[in-house]
Amino acid sequence: MQNQTMSGSSVRSGSNEQNDKVVSSLKNLIEICHTGHQGYTTAAENIKNGEYAALFRSYSAQRHAFENELKQHVNRLGGEAESTNASGLLADAAGALHRGWINIKSAVTGGGIEALLDECERGDEAAVKAYQEALEQPFPQDIAQVVRQQYHSIQEAYTRVKGLARIEA
């Protein structure tokens, strides 16, 4: 087995417990990004406001890009990134996120723009919390930097959607 450190890109595939924890955390974030991608796609397809639809499409694309970026790190660490099962360290957060985005279809059909924005806000709030928990993990520096950048972008999206929800209320 190769020696593993927590700095730079030196964590390589292996079976040690720390590597497994990093892979598990990243897989949970992949699930969170995947669910956010789907939620924002659904929101964009079902909202009549063109400005909001464009914003939601951009957030959907962002989450898809984040998902792919995290998958690359999982693959580099020897994990299988194609699995999007929410199991491991952040399963509760991923489950809460999924439940938040599941309600998006109900909001589209029954509650109009306010309900839709509320559901987007809930989904991003759960994502922010999941990323905060993930950042407590001892990631290698390069992965920690990626997760931190994604966290800040999701936090900005959350703040923006929250503001739009207040305007529409």
For the regions a protein language model found, what residue spans apply to each?
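Extreme N-terminal tail/first-helix region
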Residues: 1-23
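Carboxylate-rich helix-loop segments that flank metal/cofactor sites and access channels
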Residues: 2-10, 72-128
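Alpha-helical bundle segments that constitute or directly flank the non-heme di-iron/ferroxidase center
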Residues: 15-48, 114-137
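Alpha-helical scaffold segments that form or flank carboxylate-/histidine-based iron centers
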Residues: 21-29, 50-69, 89, 113-119, ...
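Amphipathic alpha-helices that form helix-helix packing interfaces
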Residues: 29, 36, 66, 73, ...
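Secondary-structure edge/capping motif, primarily at the C-terminal ends of alpha-helices
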Residues: 40-48, 77, 81, 108-111, ...
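Conserved alpha-helical segments that form or flank metal/cofactor-binding pockets of metalloenzymes
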Residues: 53-94, 161-164, 168
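Preference for long, well-ordered alpha-helical segments
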Residues: 116-169
